[in-house]
């Protein structure tokens, strides 16, 4: 289970720039496709062997240029509740504002480590100006320039030194860990209640060592697994779940703690931007996926044509990853809910599936010979050998060739698709690595 670091601060202090600098991406700023524009608010950072999730909580506020005090307060409260370390970003050029002081006042009362990041210190002459930030009472300000990267490496050193030691969840049995995720009112609580029902003797709540993690052991109908919850679904109910960034941030720990995620969609509303954001978290964490279209009892026309229409629309929105099961259920009437668990178990088993090396080469090499990678400057790229890496959390295949650097993503997708056509990896991501032979 990874740690979470949250970036907070008023608008225009450089939170998104810092986020892009630390995660090494410019993904959402460069690529403003519908449904992906909020992707930049969540990323993975690895530094000196330590990994953490980084969240720009301010990015979840709509029209963040015109943020009101109330929205900033909400943003900070979310960070306090969810994060292990908080980066409080301020602007060394403009100094302290009333809004900065209000944020600092809230942060002083919280029990999380806070690092004051004095941004826009683009040259060393500006560093002395950061002394006024001592008045926050939150310790020594850390001068950086997110725009040119000055001192951001030192900031990362400071962050990883401040992170709490990761505690490993020790569960009594090695069982699939299944998370029910989705935006508010998609039916998460209803599905969990349908699974658990009144038979409280069939479940055992195991408090995780990580804050707010709860593993509910489920054994019924011959199925055994842990239901992963971070107290966001059953314990806290609908408190603040109307806030999009709140429910998505809340999903992060649940997803990171799971093997397979059941993404709940509302049949009456189709697939929306918030569904896309949560799907993006599943993809980035390389978890197994089952998509459930809930509230199917409310749809009058349940013909195969309508089912096909829903299925096509979902796969188009979630492309390029389309090899996942889609189930049409009703948590309220308990229609097909057992199928959800059975399918999640199949996806879990696909994650640990191994293909014998001899069979892999026997099937894939003739395909590659018929459809070789594009030549580079007249040089032919020859893939000579394929193997699957030893069991990990994600099935991973290595293709050995003479010019690995010239095999691009479209051809890697082609290889992945051919593997999926020949072996059942439904619901699980696949890693494709190209190495020099």
UniProtKB/Swiss-Prot annotation:
GO terms for molecular function: GTP binding; ribosome binding. Keywords: GTP-binding, Nucleotide-binding, Repeat, Ribosome biogenesis. The keyword ATP-binding does not apply. It holds the Pfam family KH_dom-like. It comes from the Bacteria. Residues 3-167, 176-352 form the EngA-type G domain. GTP 2 binds at residues 182-189, 229-233, 294-297. The keyword Flavoprotein does not apply. GO terms for biological process: ribosome biogenesis. InterPro entries: G_ENGA, GTP-bd, GTPase_Der, KH_dom-like, KH_dom-like_a/b, P-loop_NTPase, Small_GTP-bd. SUPFAM superfamilies: P-loop containing nucleoside triphosphate hydrolases (SSF52540). Signal peptide: none annotated. GTP 1 binds at residues 9-16, 56-60, 119-122. Residues 353-437 form the KH-like domain. Belongs to the TRAFAC class TrmE-Era-EngA-EngB-Septin-like GTPase superfamily. EngA (Der) GTPase family. PANTHER family: GTPASE DER. GTPase that plays an essential role in the late steps of ribosome biogenesis. Associates with the 50S ribosomal subunit. This is GTPase Der. It comes from Parabacteroides distasonis (strain ATCC 8503 / DSM 20701 / CIP 104284 / JCM 5825 / NCTC 11152). The gene is der.
């Amino acid at each position: 289970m990874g740690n979470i670091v949250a970036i907070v601060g008023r608008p225009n202090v450089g939170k998104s720039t810092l986020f892009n600098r630390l995660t090494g991406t410019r993904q959402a700023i460069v690529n403003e496709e519908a449904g992906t524009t909020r992707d930049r608010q969540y990323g993975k950072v690895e530094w000196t062997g330590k990994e953490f999730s980084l969240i720009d909580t301010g990015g979840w506020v709509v029209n963040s240029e015109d943020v009101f005090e109330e929205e900033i307060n909400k943003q900070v409260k979310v960070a306090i509740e969810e994060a292990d370390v908080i980066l409080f970003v301020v602007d060394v050029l403009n100094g302290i504002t009333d809004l900065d002081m209000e944020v600092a006042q809230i942060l002083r009362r919280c029990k999380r480590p806070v690092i004051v990041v004095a941004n826009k210190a683009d040259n060393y002459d500006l560093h002395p100006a950061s002394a006024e930030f001592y008045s926050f009472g939150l310790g020594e300000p850390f001068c950086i320039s997110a725009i040119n990267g000055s001192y951001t490496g030192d900031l990362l050193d400071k962050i990883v030194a401040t992170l709490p030691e990761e505690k490993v969840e020790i569960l009594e049995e090695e069982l699939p860990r299944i998370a029910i995720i989705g935006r508010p009112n998609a039916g998460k609580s209803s599905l969990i209640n349908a699974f658990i029902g009144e038979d409280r003797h069939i479940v055992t709540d195991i408090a995780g060592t990580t804050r707010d993690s709860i593993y509910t052991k489920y054994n019924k109908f011959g199925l055994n697994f842990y239901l992963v919850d971070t107290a966001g679904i059953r314990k806290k109910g609908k408190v603040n779940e109307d806030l999009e960034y709140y429910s998505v941030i809340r999903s992060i720990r649940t997803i990171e703690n799971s093997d397979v995620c059941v993404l709940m969609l509302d049949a009456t509303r189709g697939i929306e931007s918030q569904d896309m954001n949560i799907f993006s978290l599943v993809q980035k964490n390389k978890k197994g996926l089952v998509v459930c279209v809930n509230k199917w009892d409310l749809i009058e026309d349940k013909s195969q044509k309508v089912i096909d229409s829903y299925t096509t629309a979902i796969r188009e929105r979630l492309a390029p990853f389309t090899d996942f099961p889609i189930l049409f259920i009703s948590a309220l009437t308990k229609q097909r809910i057992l199928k959800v668990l059975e399918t999640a178990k199949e996806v879990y088993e696909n994650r640990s599936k191994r293909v014998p090396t001899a069979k892999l080469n026997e099937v894939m090499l003739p395909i590659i010979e018929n459809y070789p990678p594009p030549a580079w400057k007249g040089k032919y790229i020859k893939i000579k050998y394929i193997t699957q890496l030893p069991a990990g959390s994600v099935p991973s295949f290595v293709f050995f060739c003479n010019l690995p650097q010239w095999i691009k993503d479209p051809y890697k997708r082609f290889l992945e698709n051919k593997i999926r056509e020949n072996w059942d990896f439904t619901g699980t991501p696949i890693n494709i690595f190209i190495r020099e032979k």
